[in-house]
Swiss-Prot record:
Compositional bias segments (type: Low complexity): 1029-1053
Lineage of producing organism: Eukaryota, Metazoa, Ecdysozoa, Arthropoda, Hexapoda
Chain coiled-coil ranges: 1378-1404
An example Gene Ontology molecular-function term: GTPase activator activity
Residues of the SH3 domain: 295-363
Compositional bias (Polar residues): 759-771, 928-939, 1071-1097, 1779-1790, 1807-1818
Signal peptide start and end residues: none
Site, as annotated: Arginine finger: 459
Modified residues (Phosphothreonine): 843, 1118, 1121, 1679
Biased composition regions of type Basic and acidic residues, renumbered to the chain: 1058-1069, 1793-1806
Domain Rho-GAP: 424-618
The protein, known as: GTPase-activating protein CdGAPr
Length: 1843
């Protein structure tokens, strides 16, 4: 029976198929070519068959008579067309049923034989197609249907004729059963009349109609608006076929009226067999079906006979060879699809067949998956033919993959497959996820409503890394924990994420189709409020349901947020400005037409209206008469028709929209769907082709601005050309005549391939290749090129801005032409234009996200242009950032849009270096929103902006500072807030992704920090910043950090992205505190004073540049540190600061104290180095946090005096006994600096010096530090000493207090004194002795602080060596915290001795030449005694605490001891018992073991200790500062500290215990020095062991190393080292309460003996004195040179370096001295290494140049290039490195060399730095003020790069 049935069915089907084959192929929705040819004629002639009652037949329980009608009989249609359209199998699972075969009217005609409706047999329910839920539900980004008519054809229709489509069941039984039929059994012939192609027929069942209805009202229409009846409800109401027919006819009639371009749902269009251009799906073509060229995935042969049951099936005979096209797994479908050679070899039959009927050929096809019951063709049974083996493994693998592929559902269930969230159509996403509103919106809105009532919410941007992390979490369909403390510290990241989500929607929340409706509604006269409200309600109701629900929720949320405008400053108007570009976008605007300018203001007005009246608009909708009027009942056809007419107008796109869409299709169309093609639409064709095509087709159309419908009707050819292709990233204008050609040869891809041949590598590197693409800025490929590229990019962007503006004045066609040509032009200008142009933007990236980006770039470029200081650059940069190609090339599907945009930005940015480009990309988007918003969306981005801007700033020296530097950091501020924010958010994400992509690269890591550093929050202060730009620029890095700090007035934690991770929660959380803003302001003020010095501009440049380069590098060298770096804590100084900021812990709200604290604590480590530099600078400059330099600069002016007062108080506290006061004391000098110009300068210098150590890690900081050290240090340190003394006076006698505080203050004062003592004493001779002594103390303390920071950073850079030292130092610090008071006293005594000694020394080298010579002599001479004293003191402390570590001290004598000394001295404030020997031993013995523990404890401590640190009781810190100075610069201290003892003898006398211990310590140091001389190499190498500690304490280690290396640098480096040491002490003291990042922890970990501290202090004072004499001249020359000119400084430094070469020889003679210096150098070299690393990628060239100059001069430029610290460190490291080189201090030298030689990875930089340490010249360079050198180098680098 079954045979009979199958035979009869087969005969009928084949006969029918034969006819259809003759008429033409049969096509279906799936487009599978179907050509069934009857095998025999008799089958076709077979009489009607009567099915015997088989189970399937029983379901029908009737005889079915089938009648085959020849194709000729069809009057209007070719048989193939009609039948192809009726391919049921493609739409419904019922397709397999025999009812699909043409019904034949038999003896028993059905009651309604002509009825168009057919009942489908129930016998077969299996579907050969995956279920709908298995199919991807997607939405087109652009749809251009035009008028669409869908009609139901009845039997009378001429189109139907007697076609098989009018099939009906025959027979009485079937008829009667059918009369009581269910609508589901009905089939309909539907005629689709699209505008752009001939009408065609499709066959659909009632079930299909229900599906259509469901999809329409789930994705497109609200039923109340559509007026369509619910088909499911109708099913129960339709008793007869006629009722069903009538209902369906009316339904389709209504649908035809409302159908418009809003039908973006791919499922609906596929149902209609239409593509998004209104054309029939290509596969419906009979010709295409017959000539199918789909590649086969396997070969099979028939093992069972199968006769086609439907037109889209093929017959299989046993033995037939079949090429399998699609082989779904049995779980998905039993149906395979393949093609079979016909009897005529030239023809193929293509169709479906059961997989059980064939057996695959080849043993490589895995058949282990379950097969259907009849496994006749199982692999085991199928013979293996070698015929396909020749295809090789690739084919076999592909086939096996296809065969074994899991189903979508299974992939989803397993979590492997996830639907996109970002950059996914809203309706598509909600349908796929089953949510009413996006989870992103719900989660973020709830979080912001709970925690986000803060200033600038939605205006400021969050940290890019956090945004990216959140984005990835949502894309992975998991809701991140927004309630964790880390996120609460960066609330702006959540708000940025939310804006980014809406910005990247392919179809905006307020859809393209309704854009004009919104505009019309809002343009109603104000006096017609009711009318406006009514129109707005109607327009909102027209939104697709998902959009409506989402908009309602969002508007209500924004309304709630606006109610807190008193606290947030975000009124409904401000929110509208920020949100408008994310919610409303016009195709015309995105296409870059003149309308781009037109809609910006309107968007904000519409958004504001929606926010203000959300309750009226949305809540009243249900009761609104308009809404009910929209609802049409099936019974009220007239009402429906009338409503439909009205709705038709509203629902269909207006002509302007159509025109815009057409234009987009022509110009942007290509760009619109880059998601299909990663290639940008604009790049698909050559520039000439694009221009020609635009002029030929689009030009006229665009000029005419005709609606698409008009266009199509008017010129069918043009229209067809325009919309004849599926949108795949390019419109017809860009697409070649052949669609496949477009796919095969996208221009953008072609360009990319050559540029990015190693594309996979480029993804992970910051190389400019990413930016290579079109941008003519390929210059950025090199680091130096990147600088130049940035400059050129900025220029290009300016040009582009002008072009963009010009574009708006030109006809759209011309504009599009220009845009296209520009986009395709590989010129920077063109690149910018392209990126700006919507085409290029969309084309470059996924059309969805990129189109938004491009929209913002293009749209906001003009808009933002006025808002931004450099709008054109913003535009071009943004545009570049949003290149779609670039994003798509990103390959990062999770964050496609983010990655894509950043990559696009890179391509566009290529002018900048890869890192520069990347930074630019971030910076620009960030800058745009951040400047306008006064907050860079993400600190990371801003740093890049700052970096970019710094490059610009370098290019335009002073202006860049205020304009470029400020602009870059505040570039976001400049740009329109809302749009910029959007861009910025996207860029943030993109950049974050890029960072993740390139995180391996040194640049990338620093970039992260840069972004943090760049967090300028308040654009309003930006004007002040612009004025203060010298400060901000001198705080180049601080600009970045300041940006972030400013921007994150509360979550400043961003700055230390990675290093902060541990601290981040606290830091950011603390930072959130409002204190941070005031503190930031103060900090800014401090940097401003610094810049106010002559060095303002110079400092500005170097810092800015360093920010760019250094920050980037920072990330790599100290990923851990960045997380921990307390950039935010610095900013958060008011609140509990990060582990780094002990000062922050002090109740002081002075940001400067915070800066000092964080800098001192070194928590900021590398990532916070920029911040720390800025902190130090800012602290000294009366701004505690560099990060807030810009904003705080503006605010600092206001808060400057307060900051000074605070700083004074903090200094008093520090001077008193506060470990925290150490850091606060630095801030106090900064405040004083703010008060006094000289003081400001000195503070700025001190800050620069302080940050210089930090800067050693960060090239950016370094250059900034260098400049301050050059100018600010000389002045600043003097004044700082004075100020410190003043503060000390307040708390106690200036000297006495200062001596006590000096332990904290001395490091920076010593550094300042060292670098400034010569200058300062010479320049300010009247205070020369006293002031110098004061400075020496203050400088020593500040230097110690700064040095501590720098050492920490350097240690991070040189974490290997540093690790040991830091561990020991941390231990010392831990133990030394309580001994800090004793140590402070001892250090004070030592300082007194040093003071005297330094006074003498200072008097000796009053002349610069003398100073250079003296410096060398001093280094050789004094290091002996002074260093011995220091060493003795340190040794005592260390020995007491770390006797077992003595060996290590010997090994690390030069490296670890200096670091240890610094740490000890820092620690002395904490624990006077800290022993250098123990410290050294610890470092030597178990660097890794100790370091990690200390690192964690330190970090934890830093986090916890800020509160304690805030307690002034840590007054002993001053002694630790001195100890730090001595330890960090053991040689330096031995030189300077002895000088200090001489100069500051009075103060040191106060610390009698210190002085008493000093001799012992000195002797011990002397003995140790000797051992250290030989152990120096070991120390240098042991730090290499430190890597174990590097993870947690990499920064700390590096800092320690830097401190050592810096110590030899008696001048600036010594000061820096001392400052670093002091910071370490402060850190240690802070570590007791708040272990500073890495270094501080190390310091706290090690308890320095007071004696050792005293010895260290003495040594350091002597060293400082000597360095003051020698280094002051050197540092003065260097500082002056740096301040005056980077190149001059380099020259002088080279001279110095020569003298140092002599000194090196002398040092070799004096091994002890050299060893001492080596110890110091160890820290310095580490600093150098760290600095080099910091400069590594972003500023490698700069750093190298600096290094060379510095080494040429006096300081080792390697270290110098590494950071500001390296400048100072170079001074101390000079001798130390010389010694180290003698003893193999290679670990330090390599970094120096690296920086010198060329931009390298930070590791290389470290190596070079070490290598240079080995080199005598390099060591001497380290001895010289590394800050100045590094800053100079960074400045040069920046300038060269910019130029």
């Amino acid at each position: 029976m079954s045979d009979k049935v199958s035979t009869s069915l087969a005969a009928q089907l084949h006969s029918h198929a034969l006819a259809s084959a003759e008429a033409g192929g049969i096509g279906g929705v799936n487009g599978g070519p179907i050509a069934c040819h009857a095998s025999t004629d008799k089958d076709a002639q077979a009489p009607p068959l009567q099915f015997e009652m088989d189970a399937p037949a029983a379901a029908i329980s009737a005889q079915l008579n089938f009648k085959i009608v020849p194709a000729d009989s069809l009057p209007g249609l070719s048989y193939q067309d009609m039948f192809a359209s009726m391919n049921t199998s493609q739409i419904s699972n019922a397709s397999t049923e025999s009812s699909c075969s043409p019904p034949i009217q038999g003896a028993v005609p059905p009651p309604k034989p002509s009825r168009h409706m057919a009942v489908q047999p129930l016998n077969s329910k299996s579907c050969r197609f995956p279920k709908l839920e298995e199919c991807a539900h997607f939405h087109y980004e652009r749809v251009q249907l035009g008028p669409l008519s869908v009609q139901l054809l009845d039997d009378k229709s001429e189109h139907m004729g007697s076609s098989i489509a009018s099939q009906s069941l025959g027979g009485d039984l079937p008829h009667s059963s059918l009369r009581s039929f269910s609508p589901e059994s009905c089939w309909f012939i539907i005629r689709v009349c699209p505008q752009r192609c001939e009408p065609f027929l499709i066959k659909r069942s009632f079930e299909n109609m229900q599906l259509l209805d469901e999809m329409l009202h789930r994705c497109v229409y609200d039923r109340k608006i559509s007026g369509l009846r619910n088909m499911e409800e109708l099913a129960a109401e339709l008793p007869s076929e006629s009722d069903v027919e009538y209902a369906v006819a009316k339904y389709l009639e209504r649908f035809s009226k409302i159908a418009s371009d809003s039908l973006t749902c791919g499922t609906i269009l596929t149902w209609l067999q239409l593509d998004n251009k209104g054309r029939r799906l290509p596969l419906a073509d009979g010709e295409t079906q017959r000539t199918i060229n789909t590649p086969a995935v396997g070969a099979a042969y028939g093992v069972r006979r199968y006769q086609a049951q439907a037109p889209d099936e093929i017959n299989i005979e046993v033995g037939d060879m079949i090429s399998v096209i699609d082989m779904p797994s049995p779980a998905e479908s039993i149906w395979w699809r393949g093609k079979k050679s016909h009897l005529q070899k030239s023809l193929y039959e293509v169709g479906f067949f059961p997989q059980s009927c064939v057996a695959t050929i080849g043993d490589k096809v895995p058949r282990n998956f379950p097969m259907p019951a009849p496994l006749v063709g199982h692999l085991d049974a199928s013979p293996t033919k070698p015929v396909l083996r020749k295809h090789g493994k690739l084919i076999a693998f592909f086939r096996s993959f296809i065969l074994s592929r899991p189903s979508r559902r299974r992939l989803k269930q397993s979590g492997i497959y996830r639907e996109r969230v970002f950059n996914c159509d809203l309706s598509e996403h909600l349908l796929n996820s089953g949510q009413d509103i996006p989870m992103v919106l719900r989660s973020c809105a709830e979080f912001i409503e709970n925690y986000g009532v803060i200033d600038g919410i939605y205006r400021l941007s969050g940290i890019t890394s956090n945004i990216q992390r959140l984005r990835r979490a949502f894309d992975e369909e998991r809701v991140p924990d927004l309630g964790n403390p880390e996120m609460k510290q960066d609330i702006h990241a959540v708000s940025s994420l939310l804006k980014m989500y809406f910005r990247e929607l392919p179809n905006p929340l307020c859809t393209y189709q309704l854009y004009d409706n919104f505009v019309e509604a809002i343009q109603v006269k104000a006096d017609e409020a009711d009318e406006r409200l009514r129109l707005m309600k109607e327009t909102v109701l027209k939104l697709p349901p998902p959009h409506y629900r989402t908009l309602k929720y969002l508007a209500e949320h924004l309304y709630k947020v606006s109610q807190h405008h008193g606290r947030t400053g975000m009124t409904d108007k401000n929110l509208a400005i920020v949100w408008a570009p994310n919610l409303l976008r016009s195709p015309a605007l995105e296409s870059g037409g003149v309308a781009a300018l037109r809609g910006v203001g309107v968007q904000a007005v519409v958004t504001e209206y929606l926010i203000r009246n959300c309750h009226n608009i949305f809540d009243a909708l249900d009761d609104h008469p308009a809404r009910h009027s929209m609802v049409a009942s099936a019974t009220a056809a007239a009402a429906n028709a009338a409503g439909g007419e009205l709705r038709l107008e509203s629902l269909t796109d207006c002509e302007s929209l159509l025109v815009e869409q057409r234009e987009q299709d022509q110009s942007l169309g290509v760009v619109e769907r880059p998601k299909s093609l990663s290639t940008g639409g604009a790049k698909l064709i050559s520039l000439e082709e694009a221009q020609e095509r635009h002029s030929r087709v689009e030009g006229a159309d665009l000029k005419q601005s005709l609606p698409i419908s008009m266009l199509t009707s008017a010129s069918s050819n043009a229209a067809s050309n325009i919309g004849s292709y599926i949108e795949v990233g390019g419109g017809p204008s860009s697409l070649p005549d052949k669609y496949h050609t477009v796919l095969s040869a996208p221009r953008s891809w072609q360009k990319r391939k050559p540029d990015k041949t190693p594309s996979w590598k480029s993804i992970f590197s910051r190389s400019q290749r990413q930016g290579n693409p079109d941008p003519g800025q390929k210059i950025t490929t090199d680091v130096k090129d990147s600088v130049a590229s940035r400059v050129s990019f900025v220029q290009a962007s300016h040009a582009h801005a002008s072009k963009e503006l010009t574009k708006h004045d030109k006809p759209k066609s011309i504009e599009l032409l220009e845009t296209t040509s520009n986009e395709r032009d590989p010129k920077p200008m063109d690149l910018c234009i392209r990126s700006n142009s919507i085409d290029s933007l969309r084309t470059v990236g996924h059309s969805r996200s990129v189109s938004h980006d491009s929209y913002f770039d293009l749209l906001q470029s003009p808009q933002r242009g006025h808002m931004t200081t450099c709008p054109s650059r913003e535009l071009s940069e943004l545009g570049l950032n949003f290149d779609r190609e670039e994003p798509e090339m990103r390959i990062f599907s999770e964050s496609e849009s983010l990655v894509s945009s950043p990559r696009v930005g890179k391509e566009n940015v290529p002018p900048a270096s890869g890192s520069a480009t990347r930074r630019i990309m971030r910076a620009r988007p960030e800058d745009f929103s951040s400047q306008t918003n006064s907050v860079n969306p993400s600190p990371k981005k801003q740093p890049r902006l700052n970096l970019l801007s710094p490059s610009s700033a370098r290019t335009m020296p002073p202006p860049p500072l205020s304009a470029p530097g400020t602009a870059s950091s505040s570039c976001g501020h400049e740009s329109g807030g809302a749009e910029n924010c959007c861009k910025r958010y996207k860029l943030e994400d993109q950049l974050c992704d890029i960072q993740f992509i390139d995180c391996g690269t040194p640049e990338n890591v620093p970039t992260t920090q840069q972004q943090f550093a760049s967090v300028e929050v308040h654009p309003p202060p930006k004007p002040a910043r612009a004025n203060q730009s010298p400060i901000s620029s001198s705080n180049g890095a601080s600009v970045g950090s300041s940006s972030s700090s400013t921007r994150y007035s509360y979550p400043s934690v961003q700055l230390g992205a990675k290093r902060k991770e541990q601290q981040d929660a606290k830091e950011r959380f603390s930072y959130q505190g409002t204190f941070t803003q005031p503190g930031q302001k103060q900090e800014s003020s401090a940097p401003r004073p610094v810049h106010s010095t002559n060095n303002g501009a110079t400092l500005r440049k170097p810092r800015v540049e360093p920010v760019e380069d250094g920050q980037i590098k920072l990330h790599v060298p100290t990923p851990t540190t960045p997380a921990r770096s307390p950039r935010y804590s610095l900013l958060l100084c008011d609140t509990e600061s990060s582990d780094n900021s002990s000062a922050v812990n002090t109740p002081q709200y002075d940001m400067e104290p915070l800066m000092l604290t964080s800098a001192m604590s070194g928590v900021s480590g590398v990532s916070s180095n920029v911040q720390q530099q800025q902190l130090l600078l800012g602290v000294d400059a009366s701004s505690s946090y560099l990060g807030s330099s810009h904003e705080s600069l503006g605010q600092n002016i206001n808060n400057h005096h307060d900051a000074e007062q605070r700083d004074m108080n903090a200094l008093k506290r520090e001077l008193s006994l506060d470990l925290n006061p150490l850091q606060p004391r630095l801030p106090q000098p900064a405040n004083r600096a703010a008060t006094l110009p000289v003081k400001d300068q000195l503070q700025a210098a001190a800050a620069a010096m302080c940050s210089s150590p930090n800067n050693s890690n960060f090239t950016d900081n370094t250059s900034q530090s260098v400049t301050p050290s050059e100018y600010g240090y000389q002045h600043l340190q003097r004044q700082l000493s004075m100020h410190s003394l003043l503060a000390t006076d307040e708390s106690s006698p200036v000297y006495e207090d200062f001596e006590q505080t000096p332990v904290k203050m001395v490091p920076s004062p010593i550094k300042s004194t060292i670098s400034i003592t010569y200058k300062s004493p010479e320049k300010e001779k009247k205070p020369s002795a006293i002031l110098e002594t004061n400075f020496d103390e203050n400088t020593v303390y500040e230097q110690v602080k700064l040095f501590r920071n720098s050492v920490t950073e350097v240690n991070q850079m040189l974490h290997e060596r540093s690790s040991l030292k830091q561990i020991a130092e941390e231990e010392q610090h831990d133990g030394g915290a309580y001994k800090a008071a004793e140590m402070t006293q001892q250090l004070l005594q030592l300082e007194q001795e040093h003071h005297d000694h330094e006074e003498q020394q200072e008097k000796e080298p009053e002349d610069e030449e003398q100073s250079q010579l003296l410096y060398e002599n001093i280094e050789l001479r004094k290091p002996k005694t002074v260093y011995e004293n220091l060493r003795g003191e340190e040794m005592k402390f260390i020995t007491e605490e770390q006797k077992p570590n003595v060996d290590r001290i010997e090994l690390d004598s030069l490296d670890s001891l200096p670091d240890n000394m610094e740490h000890e001295q820092s620690s002395p404030s904490k624990s006077p018992t800290f022993s250098v020997k123990e410290l050294a031993n610890k470092f030597e013995s178990s660097p890794v073991e100790q370091l990690p523990n200390f690192d964690f404890s330190v970090r934890g401590g830093s986090m916890k200790k800020p509160n304690e640190l805030s307690v002034p009781k840590t007054m002993p810190a001053p002694v630790p500062l001195k100890k730090l100075n001595s330890s960090a610069q053991k040689i330096t201290r031995s030189l300077d500290e002895n000088a200090f003892v001489r100069e500051f003898g009075g103060k040191q006398l106060q610390d009698l215990s210190l002085s008493n211990k000093l001799p012992e310590v000195m002797s011990e140091v002397n003995s140790r020095r000797k051992s250290f001389d030989f152990t120096r190499p070991k120390t240098l190498n042991p730090p290499k062991r430190l890597p174990g500690m590097s993870i947690t304490e990499e920064i700390c280690q590096k800092r320690v190393g830097e401190m050592e290396a810096i110590t030899p640098t008696t001048e600036n480096r010594i000061s820096l080292i001392q400052q670093n040491n002091m910071p370490k002490e402060q850190q240690s003291s802070a570590n007791q309460f708040l272990p500073p990042a890495g270094r501080k922890n190390v310091l706290t970990g090690v308890v320095l003996d007071r004696e050792r501290i005293d010895k260290i202090k003495e040594e350091r004072r002597q060293q400082l004195t000597q360095k003051y004499y020698g280094d002051t001249l050197k540092s003065r020359s260097r500082t002056e040179l740096n301040s005056e000119d980077n190149f001059p400084a380099a020259e002088s430094l080279r001279i110095k370096s020569k003298s140092r070469g002599d000194m090196h020889a002398l040092q070799k003679d004096i091994d002890m001295n050299l060893k001492q210096l080596s110890r110091v150098t160890g820290g310095g070299s580490e600093c150098t290494l760290h600095t080099g690393l910091s400069q590594g990628n972003g500023q490698e060239h700069l750093g190298q140049q600096r290094v060379r100059r510095i080494s040429d001069e006096k300081n080792q430029n390697c270290d110098t290039s590494n950071g500001g610290v390296s400048g100072i460190t170079s001074t101390s490291l000079l001798s130390v490195k010389t010694t180290a080189q003698k003893y193999g201090s290679t670990s330090k030298t390599p970094a120096n060399k690296f920086e010198r030689s060329q931009p390298m990875p930070r590791d290389r930089l470290q190596r070079n730095s070490l290598a240079e340490s080995n080199a005598g010249t390099n060591n001497r360079e380290k001895i010289s003020p590394q800050f100045s050198i590094r800053d100079v180098t960074a400045m040069f680098e920046s300038r060269s790069q910019n130029q």
